[in-house]
Amino acid sequence: MKHSVSSMNTSLSGKVAAITGAASGIGLECARTLLGAGAKVVLIDREGEKLNKLVAELGENAFALQVDLMQADQVDNLLQGILQLTGRLDIFHANAGAYIGGPVAEGDPDVWDRVLHLNINAAFRCVRSVLPHLIAQKSGDIIFTAVIAGVVPVIWEPVYTASKFAVQAFVHTTRRQVAQYGVRVGAVLPGPVVTALLDDWPKAKMDEALANGSLMQPIEVAESVLFMVTRSKNVTVRDIVILPNSVDL
């Protein structure tokens, strides 16, 4: 008996995705990739002027939504803003985040508070804003950018690692709560990616990483997200971990 393998369906025609932290890095590359698959995409970021320039370049299926995720009232109105622009929502990607590394004994707790608020509280609040809508329509995908630090404690970034462990806990408890409604929740967990989040890396560490190939490009993450949200509705990709070959974690 012959078995044929059909080509992977990656069409998002008729779907609407919304992505936080979409003005640069992983978020912007995910926006480009989902647009290329036929989706309409709402790019969410606090940098309104930059967003407007980007959507003009990206075309008529890209929409700008300026939101400061550190402001609770703006996050609480997130769904309303998305629906006003596009009329629907199928995919929500909680991608925005901040990075902090270094020894705990030398850290600034005020900086920690800002990082933890964005990576944890704001991300969870975003999901709270959009989740009832997805439950009501009995379909949808929520994706988190959780990074490898969400499953492997990384010694040089304790606070950041802790924030991503919190994200992973939220992802998989929420996933189990909402699966019954046809809503899928998953996380993409990349290793080091060339983005603005690595601006705090010491120059010597960055130069070494670029030289030895231990950094990935954002497109690697974007293609994984596309894979996750285009699977058959009876399948959930709960985690995708992607590492450069030379990263020993």
Curated annotation (Swiss-Prot):
Binding positions (NAD(+)): 20-43
Keyword terms of this UniProt record: NAD, Oxidoreductase
E.C. code: 1.1.1.56
GO cellular component: membrane
GO molecular function, one term: ribitol 2-dehydrogenase (NAD+) activity
Disulphide connectivity of cysteines: none
Complex formation: Homotetramer.
Record-given protein name: Ribitol 2-dehydrogenase
Name of the gene: rbtD
